[in-house]
Amino acid sequence: MSAPTKLILASASPRRVQLLQQAGLEPNRLVPAEIDETPLKAEHPRSLAKRLARSKAEKALERLRKDGEERDSFVLAADTVVAVGRRILPKTEIADEASNCLRLLSGRSHRVYTGICLFTPTGKLRHKLVETRVRFKRISREELEAYIASGEWRGKAGGYAIQGLAGSFVVKLVGSYTNVVGLPLHETVSLLAADGFKAYLNWPAGTQV
């Protein structure tokens, strides 16, 4: 199967777009999917990440069908969940939420799960769950206050962005770094490649970092 011409990302997340661009992939269209992200009763963080990724992909595909644009398109969605044990941390929107998350994460390990869901042009459903373990140092009161003042936590799962200032909190990371940012690149590119969409075909010659 030759590489399709369209890659649809079921997200408006700038960091997910940037990660795809890092791998040489430019989404042809962003179709953010508004869904209820509330965990079900006793839902495991793994299950939540998988369920939300699939819901986003299905919602985006439904919209594309209405627009008559689903043909020859890969529809990619992802959802990232941060958890301490089975306790799911919110995507923080207010400072108190972020402070509570960071106090909980301070000096201990947590897990970051990203569910990836991909609908192929032939209608196949592909999915993957990626897990990364992260350990934070003990965050001082002054550091916590400064981080909250930065506003970097807003809208972030677990109340932090590892690619930003919070990277200085990380003592140890086991697994995919890009998973913690919001889209595990190796697994995403592998899912696409399995159905003929090869990222390297878009790599420009003579690129310098």
Curated annotation (Swiss-Prot):
A GO BP annotation: nucleotide metabolic process
SUPFAM superfamilies, sorted: ITPase-like (SSF52972)
Keyword Glycosyltransferase recorded: no
Catalytic residues identified in the record: D79 (proton acceptor)
E.C. numbers: 3.6.1.9
Keywords: Cytoplasm, Hydrolase, Nucleotide metabolism
Catalyses which reaction(s): dTTP + H2O = dTMP + diphosphate + H(+); UTP + H2O = UMP + diphosphate + H(+)
Similarity section: Belongs to the Maf family. YhdE subfamily.
Function field: Nucleoside triphosphate pyrophosphatase that hydrolyzes dTTP and UTP. May have a dual role in cell division arrest and in preventing the incorporation of modified nucleotides into cellular nucleic acids.
Protein name: dTTP/UTP pyrophosphatase
Native organism: Chelativorans sp. (strain BNC1)
Species classification: Bacteria, Pseudomonadati, Pseudomonadota, Alphaproteobacteria, Hyphomicrobiales
